[in-house]
């Protein structure tokens, strides 16, 4: 009996070790990350699709919406097959993750001990970032790109461009090791997409009619509102839990976005004499983009400055610089996402508050952080520009990129066999 009792004690000790090693489900974090993932899906379909659709011409609104919807569907599959592995697999020379590690969810199971939610949920949350980043690029291409070429571009770009940059910053790559700060995707999402959009606009060439006359301003405003709402999942969700960091990200997102909307409105009012709803909506997106890299790193004063500075810079890029140089970035993806992403990323290195995110920026005695941020900006610009150009030039040679001039006149009818408004 004594022997049995001794064995029981030994087994209970080992059993306690086993239970101690098992991560426990944090239901609060799990619930929040499920909601955050759904919010980012809502940003893309329908938020981005409606925002872009309202900005575009009536003859191609359906094509514009289809580009966002199809990008989400296509990238969902590329992400679970290879994208997640490249972004978050075991590091290879600081550049990519093991591309075979998590194919179709292989090896993703159990509870993440760091976050307390199922590891599979991270696959879903990060999927939403990959999908919206690819969809963002479509705004530069609308009005003249073959739909088949767009599908092929979305496949290739979501495999060869987005995942490596995500790995550099969030997957243990060289920028992460250097200490680059990007809370929710200033470099990974917005600079990456903005530069790809600019390169694509240059390679595709100008449309026959390059005027920006929105076909449905209320749709633009509705899309901007949905983007703002969904962005809470984007930024606050990047805290990876229901915690103080998420609260900082949410309030900073609100403050920067409000500041940016006002900055754009008053700048436009002074410049052209009237504040427009499209301008206010663009200012909203300006603030959302600019605060993305800084959301969990800066205090409220920092978020005000970031929102205002980025919005004014983006306004002059869209209103003055683009017309002067004549490139046809149809819906201002470079001006809205590229420029604001760059400004936001650099200013994160200026305003980062150690009392918020643990890392000091220039104003808190760490000027080196600005240089690290600039390193991330330059690396992303170069990589995105070169790889995007290669992908588009290959597609141009193999399948062609542009529709015919006749198809461009009535793009929805020629590519999709339908019209948005049957009046």
Curated annotation (Swiss-Prot):
Transmembrane parts of this sequence: 31-51, 64-84, 123-143, 150-170, 183-203, 217-237, 246-266, 278-298, 301-321, 331-351, 374-394
Molecular-function GO terms, alphabetical: ammonium channel activity
GO BP annotations, alphabetical order: ammonium transmembrane transport
One of the record's GO cellular component terms: plasma membrane
Membrane topology: Multi-pass membrane protein
Entry-linked InterPro entries: Ammonium/urea_transptr, Ammonium_transpt, Ammonium_transpt_CS, NH4_transpt_AmtB-like_dom
Keywords: Ammonia transport, Cell membrane, Membrane, Signal, Transmembrane, Transmembrane helix, Transport
Location within or outside the cell: Cell membrane
First and last residue of the signal peptide: 1-20
UniProt cross-references to Pfam families, sorted A to Z: Ammonium_transp (PF00909)
Primary location: membrane
Family statement: Belongs to the ammonia transporter channel (TC 1.A.11.2) family.
Subunit organization: Homotrimer.
Role according to the record: Involved in the uptake of ammonium/ammonia (NH(4)(+)/NH(3)).
Name of the protein in question: Ammonium transporter
Organism: Aquifex aeolicus (strain VF5)
Upper classification of the organism: Bacteria, Pseudomonadati, Aquificota, Aquificia, Aquificales
């Amino acid at each position: 009996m004594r022997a049995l009792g001794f064995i029981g004690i030994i087994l209970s000790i080992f059993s306690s070790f086993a239970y101690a090693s098992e991560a426990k489900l944090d239901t609060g974090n799990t619930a929040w990350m499920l909601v955050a993932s759904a919010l980012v899906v809502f940003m893309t379909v329908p938020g981005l699709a409606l925002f872009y659709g309202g900005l575009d011409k009536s003859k191609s609104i359906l094509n514009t919406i289809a580009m966002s919807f199809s990008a989400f569907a296509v990238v969902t599959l590329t992400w679970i097959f290879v994208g997640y592995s490249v972004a978050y697999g075991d590091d290879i020379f600081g550049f990519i993750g093991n591309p075979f590690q998590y194919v179709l969810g292989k090896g993703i199971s159990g509870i993440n001990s760091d976050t307390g939610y199922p590891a599979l949920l991270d696959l879903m949350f990060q999927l939403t970032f990959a999908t919206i980043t690819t969809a963002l690029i479509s705004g530069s291409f609308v009005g003249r790109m073959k739909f088949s070429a767009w599908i092929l571009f979305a496949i290739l770009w979501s495999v060869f461009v987005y995942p490596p940059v995500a790995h550099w910053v969030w997957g243990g790559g060289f920028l992460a090791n250097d200490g680059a700060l990007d809370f929710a995707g200033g470099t990974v999402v917005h600079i990456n997409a903005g530069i790809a959009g600019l390169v694509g606009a240059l390679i595709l060439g100008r449309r026959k009619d390059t005027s920006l006359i929105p076909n449905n301003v209320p749709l633009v405003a509705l899309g901007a509102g949905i983007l703002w709402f969904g962005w809470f999942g984007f930024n606050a969700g990047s805290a990876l839990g229901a915690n103080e960091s998420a609260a900082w990200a949410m309030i900073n997102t609100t403050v920067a976005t409000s500041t940016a909307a006002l900055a754009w409105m008053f700048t436009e009012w002074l410049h052209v004499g009237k504040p427009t709803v499209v301008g206010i909506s663009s200012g909203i997106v300006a603030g959302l983009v600019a605060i993305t890299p800084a959301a969990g790193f800066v205090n409220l004063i920092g978020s005000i400055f970031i929102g205002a500075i980025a919005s004014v810079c983006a306004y002059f890029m869209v209103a003055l610089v683009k017309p002067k140089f004549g490139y046809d970035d149809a819906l201002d993806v470079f001006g809205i996402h590229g420029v604001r992403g760059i400004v936001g990323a650099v200013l994160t290195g200026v305003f980062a508050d150690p009392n918020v995110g643990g890392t000091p920026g220039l104003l808190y005695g760490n000027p080196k952080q600005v240089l690290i941020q600039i390193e991330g900006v330059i690396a992303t610009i170069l990589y995105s520009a070169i790889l995007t150009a290669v992908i588009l030039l290959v597609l141009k040679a193999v399948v062609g990129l542009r529709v015919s001039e006749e198809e461009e006149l009535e793009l929805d009818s020629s590519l999709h066999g339908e019209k948005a408004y049957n009046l």
